[in-house]
């Protein structure tokens, strides 16, 4: 694997990943962190395009067979710090029915016939991808020299799980190719992937709790708006049927429709109320999504901002007014008191 060559590390956070995807040019896609592997959580977020798993990397022997599917986009990891962005790309570039944007679409076409190592090199050389990735750099005024005897930090790694052409794949840029986990349908692929993810979680949880799982999904606001349109149509159909019954032009017999839809006034009014509640719930969810996106935006601004000059100026101002030393002494006294309490 090459050195990082100007690639920063980025935080494993759904707000960061969502903004990164948008800045690359992909439309109506977001990332959500998963706290459980329950099917109810999957159902809430569907459609799920792929899963991204972060864990502390340790070298391991691999005896699984590499898939020979040449249609799948698979790139070897060449730049260490690019692994998060590469895991995201592994999902996006293997997904159908999403708008990649002109530049990423051209990139996908350009590298389509490249071998995995060259695909990885192409990712590292893409100005669009690199600049977008590095837009999340946290400015640091301090430069630390790399000492030879300095203990290396833990290496964390991202892998992806995706459905592709009727099968579930695990994509790990440190491996020679994709691993096929089994056959699937668009509706059950998460059920196929879950046991493999659980196995990894159980393995790492024995001595390592620092891992997380995120889902790449269609934009929730767009999905909810589509749901509301469907509910509005259903409500309109029910109201038309109710109007027909009230005017006497419609039958009041369930047998006429084979019991497929409510045909009594009571049942129709009940169903209209149910649909109204569903619409209200969806609208409330949209408001929560909008609030979440505002929070993500604010958090990302704070992540990128260097607060060190502000802190230094505050300290300087306290020192000029002779208020710094009393605060330092107060802090020392508090630490001393806590140490005495623990003895």
From Swiss-Prot:
Protein name: Ubiquitin carboxyl-terminal hydrolase isozyme L5
Subunit structure: Component of the 19S (PA700) regulatory complex of the 26S proteasome.
UCH catalytic domain residues: 6-218
Pfam families for this protein: Peptidase_C12 (PF01088), UCH_C (PF18031)
Function statement: Protease that specifically cleaves 'Lys-48'-linked polyubiquitin chains. Deubiquitinating enzyme associated with the 19S regulatory subunit of the 26S proteasome.
Reactions accelerated catalytically: Thiol-dependent hydrolysis of ester, thioester, amide, peptide and isopeptide bonds formed by the C-terminal Gly of ubiquitin (a 76-residue protein attached to proteins as an intracellular targeting signal)
Domain of life: Eukaryota
GO biological process: protein deubiquitination; ubiquitin-dependent protein catabolic process
Molecular function per GO: cysteine-type deubiquitinase activity
Region (Disordered): 242-266
Feature type site, description Important for enzyme activity: 172
Species of provenance: Dictyostelium discoideum (Social amoeba)
Site (Transition state stabilizer): 77
Gene symbol of the encoding locus: uch2
Leading EC class: hydrolase
Keywords tagged on the record: Cytoplasm, Hydrolase, Nucleus, Protease, Proteasome, Thiol protease, Ubl conjugation pathway
UniProt subcellular location: Cytoplasm; Nucleus
Major site of localization recorded for this protein: cytoplasm
Residue ranges of every copy of the ULD domain listed in the record: 306-334
Family note: Belongs to the peptidase C12 family.
CDD domains to which the protein is assigned, alphabetical: Peptidase_C12_UCH37_BAP1 (cd09617)
């Amino acid at each position: 694997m090459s050195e990082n060559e100007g690639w920063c590390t980025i935080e494993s956070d759904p707000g960061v990943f969502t903004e990164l995807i948008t800045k690359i040019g992909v439309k109506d896609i977001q990332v959500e962190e998963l706290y459980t592997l329950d099917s109810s959580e999957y159902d809430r977020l569907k459609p799920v395009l792929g899963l991204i798993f972060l864990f502390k990397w340790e070298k391991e022997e691999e005896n699984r067979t590499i898939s020979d599917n040449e249609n799948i986009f698979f790139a070897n990891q060449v730049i260490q710090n690019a692994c998060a962005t590469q895991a995201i790309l592994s999902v996006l570039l293997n997904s159908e029915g999403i708008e990649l944007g002109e530049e990423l679409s051209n990139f996908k076409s350009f590298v389509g016939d490249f071998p995995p190592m060259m695909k990885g090199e192409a990712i590292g050389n893409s100005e669009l991808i690199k600049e977008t990735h590095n837009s999340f750099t946290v400015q640091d005024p301090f430069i630390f020299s790399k000492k030879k005897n300095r203990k290396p930090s833990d290496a964390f790694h991202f892998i992806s799980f995706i459905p592709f052409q009727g099968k579930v794949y695990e994509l790990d840029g440190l491996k020679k190719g994709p691993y096929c986990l089994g056959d699937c349908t668009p509706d059950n692929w998460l059920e196929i992937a879950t046991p493999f993810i659980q196995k990894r979680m159980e393995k790492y949880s024995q001595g390592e709790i620092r891992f997380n799982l995120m889902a790449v999904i269609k934009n929730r606001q767009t999905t909810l708006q589509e749901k509301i349109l469907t509910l509005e149509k259903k409500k309109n159909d029910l109201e038309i049927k109710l109007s027909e019954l009230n005017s006497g032009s419609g039958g009041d017999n369930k047998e006429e429709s084979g019991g497929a839809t409510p045909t009594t006034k009571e049942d129709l009014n009940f169903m209209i109320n149910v649909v109204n509640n569903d619409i209200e719930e969806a609208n409330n969810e949209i408001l929560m999504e909008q609030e979440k996106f505002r929070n993500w935006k604010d958090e990302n601004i704070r992540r990128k901002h260097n607060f060190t000059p502000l802190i230094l100026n505050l300290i300087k101002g306290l020192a000029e007014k002779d208020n710094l030393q009393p605060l330092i002494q107060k802090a020392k006294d508090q630490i001393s008191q806590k140490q005495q309490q623990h003895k």
